[in-house]
Amino acid sequence: MKKNKGLNEATTSEKPQFPKRTAWKIFWWVVILAIIIGILVYILMPRATTAVIEKWELSGTTLSAQIKGLSGKHTFQRINNSTYVTDDILQVSISFQGINPIVVTAHKATNGSGETIFNIANLSINQSTGKAIVNGMMTQDQKSNNGTELASIKGLHDIGTFVAPDTRARDVLNIFFGLLPIIIFVIFFLLFWRSARGISGGGRSEEDNIFSIGKTQAKLAKSSVRFDNIAGLQEEKHELLEIVDYLKNPLKYAQMGARSPRGVILYGPPGTGKTLLAKAVAGEAGVPFFQSTGSGFEDMLVGVGAKRVRDLFNKAKKAAPCIIFIDEIDSVGSKRGRVELSSYSVVEQTLNQLLAEMDGFTSRTGVVVMAATNRLDVLDDALLRPGRFDRHIQINLPDIKEREGILQVHAKNKNLSSKISLLDVAKRTPGFSGAQLENVINEATLLAVRDNRTTINMNDIDEAIDRVIAGPAKKSRVVSDADRKLVAYHEAGHALVGLHVHSNDEVQKITIIPRGQAGGYTLSTPKSGDLNLKRKSDLLAMIATAMGGRAAEEEIYGPLEITTGASSDFYKATNIARAMVTQLGMSKLGQVQYVPSQGTVPPGTKLFSEQTAKDIDFEINAIIEEQYKKARTIIKTNRKELELLVEALLIAETILKSDIDYIHEHTKLPPEILAQKQEQQAKQKAEAKEAKLNKKTEKDTEKDSETNS
């Protein structure tokens, strides 16, 4: 039975924040850049280079000397020529690594002894001006140019070393410093671009950054899903085979003059495989698959939604043939004119652009649009017309055969016990979607792993089904014996009424183990498969069964001791009764539908008069009261069976169909439950005896201590 639950939900929102991680990245990039620039400046900075004359030689009238540099890479290779221009002038031609020679001139001078002195001092080389000075002196004993050039070279050799600046490094450095502002600008632009991608979205994703505004967020992928991977849905898959054939052979349809399929919309309850079917179509056809959501088109800026629609279809045209899949299309394709956000609704702009792209002036050959929604009735009529979404395929909840197939698909790689019948599991899971069935198998696997077992048994499956229906068991919850017994009466009341009313359902399980907000629950399933049609007698039986819990409480404890545990039962019963009166024509008000069973009613619309509203309320109350009286009568006339169900629940906490049917048919406890009862009684006697002995021992100890004192 359910406990009252508040309806208030707290909502939280995250404010975008500047990511600290991005700030630190920018800081370290700047530090690294500064270090690199410093190293380059140190390497390329002009510096004095020490050179030494390595060897010299005379070739005819030309004297040459080779100079070896001592500064790493830069080697000065030759003093090419040393010749006398006149008796008074000596010219030395110097070149470095193939650079045009630099001419050095030394003028004749006379020292105090009358010797001719050629002073070549303070060698410095500037390649831009062509000037060079050699530090040292050359001495010429003779006063005329009489072939004694060798002496001049000897004099130069005797100088030993001289200093030559690396002027090429200066040129390289000038080029580097010229490019440095551009390099810094490019690096900072890249850093800003990377950080902006995260800053605008709070550092969370690329989808909300300032550089992606107006671009579609659809993901392009190749699908590996095939129809064979999907259990059930045979008719739905058959309908989609035409789309697959068109994507594979578009020319065949063009030659016959057939209009290519524009779109397919899949609608039905959540978890039934709509997205999986769309992926299977793309996988079977072997074409690209663009996946997006309806809400992914919208943004806080006006016009962004329409721009993203255009961008998506432009990309799809380039990748054609392909499939565009829009999940939850109702967020962008809802009926226009219901709620006006402004004079020109932003949402309507996006919808209008989508309508134009799907069937506008531009051709869209090779692009098939598939969409999924849980509510077809809220979509705009223009979106659903032929030429846009040509096919409307309903994806229903799987029947018993399809549930068995889905369970087999998900159990392929699981080690199930041989005692497990997937058909029985399918019978116990009516109304389950494919996603819920997958969750049942996964939960059972997790339970087996938790117990360090390599095989999944039926207990794991049972517990997994309970978890999916009502949540995990709250075995640690402290429940008094009185409350535990009250819950047992409540759930036994549901089961007892369900066993005695004329209904297509049968009771499968009763438990008083708390789960979620429920203190216990009773599981009923259809006797013969899944019926899409419900008779009036079935609906009345469902109401009576729902009221069985409150009827048992009032019958056993009285009207003043009833509890809030029946709130969810009343909710269920009231909804069924209201549908019978206002939609199904199963009341004294006649065959009239007062509330549309499909579509939505605009706010403020009045569908019936005040008197009719009173009549509807009266009929709903009359149906519920009649079925409540019926439930009270069943409980009164079958009190012994009720007590046996309660006793079995208090002993075993959970009883299954076999035990329930045994009690119903034989009006006594099943042998297994009886054996558990005897074990519990024996255990209680042993504990009572032990407690009595302990108490006696304590009294004897107290007497001995008093005697000694």
UniProtKB/Swiss-Prot annotation:
Q: How is the cofactor bound?
A: Binds 1 zinc ion per subunit.
Question: What membrane topology is given?
Answer: Multi-pass membrane protein
The terms under GO molecular function for this entry are: ATP binding; ATP hydrolysis activity; ATP-dependent peptidase activity; metalloendopeptidase activity; zinc ion binding
| Top-rank taxon | Bacteria
Task: Give GO terms for biological process.
Answer: protein catabolic process; proteolysis
Binding locations of Zn(2+)? H490, H494, D569
Name of the protein in question: ATP-dependent zinc metalloprotease FtsH
Organism listed in the record: Mycoplasma pneumoniae (strain ATCC 29342 / M129 / Subtype 1)
Question: Taxonomic classification, please?
Answer: Bacteria, Bacillati, Mycoplasmatota, Mycoplasmoidales, Mycoplasmoidaceae
